Design a protein with these regions (language model features):
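PAPS-dependent sulfotransferase catalytic core
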Residues: 1-61
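Generic hydrophobic secondary-structure signal
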Residues: 5-7, 17, 21, 85-87, ...
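A structural signal for well-ordered alpha-helical scaffolds and beta->alpha junctions
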Residues: 14, 18, 88-91, 118, ...
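General helical structural elements
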Residues: 14-15, 42, 93, 151, ...
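Enrichment for repetitive, rod-forming helical segments
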Residues: 17-18, 96, 223
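A general structural signal for well-ordered secondary-structure junctions
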Residues: 27, 131-132, 226
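PAPS-dependent sulfotransferase catalytic domain
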Residues: 61, 66-164, 171-191
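PAPS-dependent sulfotransferases, especially Golgi type II membrane carbohydrate sulfotransferases
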Residues: 156-232
């Protein structure tokens, strides 16, 4: 029996990875991608399904925040053989998804927080904490061998059973909704930043912060040997 805590940034592929991981967890999961702190920090658990294992997904939460508030937020839940996972996505694709989301919902205002969170997650990656298992979403999406490595590292029996699923949580993809449910690999998720051509996205790309994010991502691509996923 193993329990999982997964950290990710909203629109960062967290639900896709959850749908892929959960079928590989022998004995099923107790919470799925179901624990959320919607700004109120009310410690509310929303259970989806039953099982021997616990899978808790945190979105838009810094790892340092969790470390400081762990006992309060977990609210007495006991975790065994804990696997901590952090999901990191190409920042330009991530921002493009948020910009696209804002086009559909003009009152949406989370872009600046997303940028700050990405830098924090990247710093955790650079620190190479052995207790954190990183999943690079873009590499995960395209590379079956990488997915097999992740499963092996987490002690799971590899399966791509959930790979093609697009769930209607967060209304699916910012671009495609749930249109590709059953064929998720057909979505063009690796080139989202090329698909948004408006003032907000173009200004971001040329900004100092945008260029800094690009440089850090490209450095990560060198380390992960995924040069084909560099931002050019």
């Amino acid at each position: 029996m193993s329990d999982f805590i997964v950290f990710g940034i909203r629109r960062g592929g967290n639900h896709a990875i959850a749908q892929w991981l959960i079928p590989q967890i022998v004995g099923g999961v107790k919470y799925g991608h179901a624990f959320t702190l919607r700004g109120t920090r009310d410690n509310e658990f929303i259970a989806y399904g039953e099982g021997e294992n616990t899978y808790i997904g945190f979105e838009d939460i810094r790892f340092s925040e969790f470390s400081e508030n762990k006992e309060n937020w977990l609210n007495g839940i006991e975790l065994n053989d804990l696997k901590t996972i952090m999901v990191l996505r190409n920042p330009w694709n991530l921002i493009a998804s948020h910009v696209q989301w804002k086009i559909k919902r003009p009152l949406y205002t989370r872009k600046n927080k997303v940028i700050s969170l990405w830098f924090d997650y990247y710093n955790e990656y650079e620190a190479a904490d052995k207790d954190i298992n990183f999943i690079i979403y873009d590499k995960w999406f395209k590379d079956i061998n990488y997915r097999k490595q992740i499963s092996e590292k987490l002690g799971l029996e590899f399966s791509d059973e959930g790979l093609q699923t697009v769930v209607n949580i967060g209304r699916g993809s910012s671009f495609d909704g749930i249109e590709y449910d059953g064929n998720a690999q057909d979505m063009d998720v690796l080139s989202r930043y090329k698909q948004v051509d408006n003032y907000s996205m173009n200004t971001f790309k040329e900004s100092e912060i945008g260029q800094d994010l690009k440089n850090k991502w490209n450095h990560l691509c060198d380390l992960e040997e995924i040069k084909e996923l560099k931002i050019i």
